[in-house]
From Swiss-Prot:
GO terms for molecular function: magnesium ion binding; O-succinylbenzoate synthase activity. Mg(2+) binds at residues 161, 190, 213. It is an enzyme of class 4 (lyase). Converts 2-succinyl-6-hydroxy-2,4-cyclohexadiene-1-carboxylate (SHCHC) to 2-succinylbenzoate (OSB). SMART domains: MR_MLE. It comes from the Bacteria. Its EC number is 4.2.1.113. This is o-succinylbenzoate synthase. Its cofactor is a divalent metal cation. The lineage of its organism: Bacteria, Pseudomonadati, Pseudomonadota, Gammaproteobacteria, Enterobacterales. It holds the Pfam family MR_MLE_C.
Length: 320
């Protein structure tokens, strides 16, 4: 016997969260809970404004239609990426095919005063990998901050993300302020320039390795080994079903590329599932999941060690 519930939710965000030049005041999304016999499976559907092609309202419409079809015996996955991902997670939990083991290590997202960051990063246990958003300020400032962190902490490796913010000139301005002796400790820089060709040129000219992120979701993208390209950053909420995520990871690994499972600012429920996916598909790579502190609460499932208050399922708005 099948049954299902769909919940709608909103979580207040910290004041400083800006995506694609717009301030994100609340994170909105949906949960689906599927039950069959004694088993149940959960999934999160939370399109990311400015990055997902679908809106929250469009995802809700597609999800409700899919759930009704599933209750009637139809299991075909929807095409909309955020819905396909959430539904496939729920089905995987239901079938016990999503392993429970999780990778809760995080590459901390570095914000704020560089002196405070140096103290925090120097105290990190184990492998020191951190992430810095660049492209939000002047490229020269970004270069100086990155150089300062790498100089102060000799065993630190940085993942940088420019979100295609730079022209070739700005990319060169950034690189000018990063000591060539430190550049090998930039694990990768995600999508430095507005076009892939400019990003490739940046890698050739600076010796700084790059990673593809937005490019993975463009229709003309193909997985190929290229000089200067070290990694792909896979955001499952923007990608689609678990099968599609696994196919992309396998394609990257076959070329010797690092595949990083990364957050689209999901709630704690979605983040714990991403941690399980990372442990399953990319066990040797620290995932990019350090986004929970951008929110003011957890929901349904806790992220280990987080002090944020937990909102229980009974407090959510039920749609079905």
């Amino acid at each position: 016997m099948r049954s299902a519930q769909v919940y709608r939710w909103q979580i207040p965000m910290d004041a400083g969260v800006v995506l694609r030049d717009r301030r994100l005041k609340t994170r909105e999304g949906l949960y689906v809970c599927l039950r069959e016999g004694e088993r149940e499976g959960w999934g999160e559907i939370s399109p990311l404004p400015g990055f997902s092609q679908e809106t929250w309202e469009e995802a809700q419409s597609v999800l409700l239609a899919w759930v009704n079809n599933w209750l009637a015996g139809d299991c075909e996955l929807p095409q909309m990426p955020s819905v396909a991902f959430g539904v496939s997670c729920a089905l995987a939990e239901l079938a016990d095919t999503l392993p429970q083991a999780a990778n809760y290590r995080a590459a901390p997202l570095c914000n704020g005063d560089p002196d405070d960051l140096i103290l925090k990063l120097a105290d990190m246990p184990g492998e020191k990998v951190a992430k810095v958003k660049v492209g939000l300020y002047e490229a020269v400032r970004d270069g100086m901050v990155v150089n300062l962190l790498l100089e102060a902490i000799p065993d630190l490796h940085l993942r940088l993300d420019a979100n295609r913010a730079w022209t070739p000139l700005k990319g060169q301005q950034f690189a000018k302020y990063v000591n060539p002796d430190y550049r090998h400790r930039i694990a990768f820089l995600e999508e430095p320039c507005k076009t892939r060709d400019d990003s490739r040129a940046f890698a050739r000219e600076t010796g700084i390795a790059i990673a593809w992120d937005e490019s993975l979701r463009e229709p003309d993208f193909a997985f190929v080994a290229e000089k200067g390209v070290r990694a792909v950053v896979i955001k499952p909420t923007l990608t689609g079903s678990l099968d599609k995520v696994r196919e992309q990871v396998q394609a990257a690994h076959a070329l010797g590329l690092t595949a990083v499972i990364s957050s689209s600012i999901e709630s704690s429920l979605g983040l714990t599932q991403l941690a399980r996916i990372a442990a399953w598909l990319t066990p040797d790579t620290i995932p990019g999941l350090d986004t929970l502190d951008l929110m003011q609460a957890q929901q349904v499932r806790r992220w280990p060690g987080s002090p944020l208050p937990l909102v229980e399922v009974d407090a959510l708005e039920r749609l079905l």
